[in-house]
């Protein structure tokens, strides 16, 4: 039996978000729907989830002592990481002391860097992956590239949104790629992964829920990447029945090996009927924002249900839908959005994240659309994005 208290009362159920971006904001909203007390934590003030939380804190989440202190002050029943850059050793210790880390400390620790999850998938579970090598110096990086061959991709073992990633076609690019990777890591300079290029027809995110009543799969989400970050996503991605079955088998193996209850974003390459594992996030995925319009339970609602120990039962997908990001490039601490009326309508929605400032290119919102097919939905979402005028 799951008992939920009422926010701001002595018996409140408290959820602490570690990372308070746009994904955490939607998780906070789903918690609010259930009367849960929400505490939002991030490294900067006025982060999106802080707007819809009962309280907030600004700390360096890679500082284990600072993390332990804020948890001791707030005494959350559930600790919900939204990002990778967290002192996961501290989370593991706190879990050993009886705290509930979502989905579990092992999952957050293994997936905080690409090395942990790649070794689990390829070496322990025997899942198909790209060829890869790890390196922690420029010399070993060059050796890794020689072993993998050209073309290849280099990524910091801990980064997100394409930061520090390079596509390498020739030896002349190696010095710059190494330098860029060292600048792009979430925790600063360090190890990198060198991956062989996989020939694939498309990429998918298979949103997979590990819940008290079993493992559930959302319809596959297709997406387009640019500069290492997603620009549009759509659901459902058409694929063969055999490929879908293989994708679900891989996702099931991965989430059960990681453990705990929650939603996982499993990233896969698909080529015909073949499926290759890429990465996994033990939390809602940015490409999954399409589920805000495409499903009866969004990825955020599913995550909250799962980690609270509530049954999922079933997931209803309404039909073709898409998301497209609002990604302006400017500098401002007072952003406004004009012509919004052109971005909403029947089967057309928009979300502005409420980020407090922008300096360069930053994702500030997303347009959501339905359509007769995914192609039409993508066109409608992109048109909505182009209609919005972002002002300084």
Swiss-Prot record:
Domain called ATP-grasp: residue spans: 119-308
Pathway info: Purine metabolism; IMP biosynthesis via de novo pathway; N(2)-formyl-N(1)-(5-phospho-D-ribosyl)glycinamide from N(1)-(5-phospho-D-ribosyl)glycinamide (formate route): step 1/1
Chain positions recorded as Mg(2+) binding sites: 267, 279
Enzyme class: ligase
Chain residues that bind N(1)-(5-phospho-beta-D-ribosyl)glycinamide: 22-23, 82, 286, 355, 362-363
An example molecular function term from Gene Ontology annotations: magnesium ion binding
Matching InterPro entries: ATP-grasp, ATP-grasp_carboxylate-amine, ATP_grasp_subdomain_1, PreATP-grasp_dom_sf, PurT, PurT/PurK_preATP-grasp, PurT_C, Rudment_hybrid_motif
Alphabetically ordered keywords of this record: ATP-binding, Ligase, Magnesium, Metal-binding, Nucleotide-binding, Purine biosynthesis
PANTHER family hit by this protein: FORMATE-DEPENDENT PHOSPHORIBOSYLGLYCINAMIDE FORMYLTRANSFERASE
Record note on quaternary structure: Homodimer.
Protein name as annotated: Formate-dependent phosphoribosylglycinamide formyltransferase
Organism: Salmonella arizonae (strain ATCC BAA-731 / CDC346-86 / RSK2980)
